[in-house]
Amino acid sequence: MKKLNIALLAGGNSSEREVALASAAMILDAFDRSRYNVIPVDVHGLHWTCKGAGDRKVEVDKTDFSVPVGDGKIRFDYAFIMIHGTPGEDGKLQGYLEMMGIPYSTSGFVSSVETFDKTLCKRIVSEIDGLCLAREVLLRRGDRVDADAIAARLGLPVFVKPNASGSSCGVTKVKSVADMVPAIERAFTESDAVLIEEFIEGRE
């Protein structure tokens, strides 16, 4: 039986890059090598590389999702995405792979786009009858920050978080007005927009 060529896409561009690489290393050990030819691909910005002979980095040809080997090339049959944050969870990789006609391991392009952007996701689910959502303030890079006005509108504490990020990186529970701006600045290191939500006490 012909082995399937699997691209194990790891790394990414977020602050979780090293965690994603470590996760991919564990996944790599779990593949049945008698059935799959697994090639780890480090995705970092526009550079998608895998190890060639002598640990030489080889660039993936993104025009046909292949990797050069000797005088030929290996075309990937499937993509296993092990990237936290962008571009593995926000629809970028999913959109590319769908254009290439390559099946992959995560949710689809549309659902990835709609759920990675927290504000967009809230707009969509707000149409569900009976579903209550936390009140919010959305800030975009360059917006004027009025911490007193935000606290007056939402109360304290509030949660300050990147609007588009793959995990809890950059998330802060803010209990005072004085801590608001530093928390917003921290969230902006992870995303171009920051979502501030009221605190809702309850059981998760």
Residue ranges and their predicted role:
Residues 101-104, 131, 162-169:
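Acidic/polar active-site rim loop that often engages polyanionic ligands
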Residues 139, 171-176:
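Short beta-strand-to-turn element immediately C-terminal to the catalytic PLP-Schiff-base lysine
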Residues 175-204:
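Phosphate-binding site of ATP-dependent enzymes
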Residues 1-110, 114-116, 120, 124-127, ...:
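ATP-binding N-terminal substructure of ATP-dependent carboxylate-amine bond-forming enzymes
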Residues 125, 151-171, 192-202:
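ATP-grasp fold ATP-binding core
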Residues 124-132, 186:
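Basic phosphate/pyrophosphate-binding loop/patch that engages nucleotide-derived ligands
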